[in-house]
Amino acid sequence: MMHENTFSPYTVRRLTEGDIPTILKLYESNSEYFRYCPPNPTWASVQEDMLALPPAKTMADKHFIGFFERDALIAVMDLIDRYPDAQTAFIGLFMVDQNRQGRGVGAHIVRRLSDVLRTEGCRRIRLGIIQDNLPARRFWQRLDFQLTGLEFEKEHSAVLEAEKML
């Protein structure tokens, strides 16, 4: 998945602690997201996102990756391999810089990711959508993600599970 040309015209790489200032800037550009999912981002919350893992998973299963246009970070994704089962990839977070939204950047990345995961034998992608975040819900549904009917509570909001069969 990490091949540089896979997401052309964007380059992709694993993000590190040295990228936190840039990631935080991207997070801060998305005030609408943090209205649905408080609190506002901080250095510590970015670190938490970079290290967060679901039960029984290790950092080897986690891909906290950045998508770059030239040298500018334009999107961040937290992808967990084989979760919650061996045929599923789980997107824990996907955020596009506010200034790039509405231009097809996010859709392009998700479509390419779907192609890559399919060729690697993955059968579905699963994620959570904050219930009240209607723009996010529309975005994922346009990309053929369907609500599964499962719902869980996050600290400040209800989250709806959605998945796409590959």
Regions found by a protein language model. Give the residues of each.
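Conserved GNAT acetyl-CoA-binding A-motif
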Residues: R118-G128
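Conserved beta-strand-loop-alpha-helix junction that forms the acyl-donor binding cleft
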Residues: L127-R137, E153-A158
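Residues forming the Rossmann-fold NAD(P)(H) cofactor-binding site
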Residues: A107
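Terminal substrate-recognition subdomain of acyl/acetyltransferases
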Residues: M2-H3, S157-L166
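Active-site acidic-Proline motif in GNAT/NAT acetyltransferases
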Residues: D97-N99, R103, Q131-D132
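Conserved acetyl-CoA-binding loop of GNAT-fold acetyltransferases
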Residues: Q141-L150
